[in-house]
Amino acid sequence: PARQVANGVVDSFIHVVEQYLTYPVNAKVQDAFSEGLMRVIHEEGLKVLDNPNDYDIRANLMWAATNALNVWIGQGVPQDWSSHRMGYALTAQFGLDHAQTLAILLPGVMTYMFKEKQVKLARMGEVVFGITDGTEEERARKAIVACEDFFRRMGLKTRLGECGIAEKDLDALAAPVDKQGWKLGEHHNIDSRMAREIMALRL
């Protein structure tokens, strides 16, 4: 089904992002692997919904998805799985598809933690989305817009309000972060207060 294909594309893309989009540690091999995977998933993902029976598109996506979470690209690099952890509450409390929660939350994490992620965001914008104009900060901000646009083109929503979730729901959605004792993000500093603020950016 198209919905599951879109979910798989977006989930695979974000698996790579969360192992890549932190801060530079001169891990050139892992960065190159991740950038190549994101580029392939982006390019082939945009084709697959219109060409669901194209074997080559499917094969490239399946191989990219396999490499998105087979631990290779995460070796020796900081990782940020905060979108995943926060997304669990959206699925548990509102029944949203896993990939749908990620498409909503990741742009919020990128925006909220912008200073920490600016260098890698700008690099991602250049090599994945072809963004070359502007300062590093401008390219980094354009990369966030490009990511959200990609998710929308895949047919996913990118705002909590589109899923019937309002500000009154945010306390309950953010509470599991502290309840589970999680300290999220590459710096292990995102608590429930910060999680709520990230979610508020996505209303």
Feature locations, PLM:
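C-terminal charged capping/lid subdomain of soluble metabolic enzymes
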Residues: L121, I131-L203
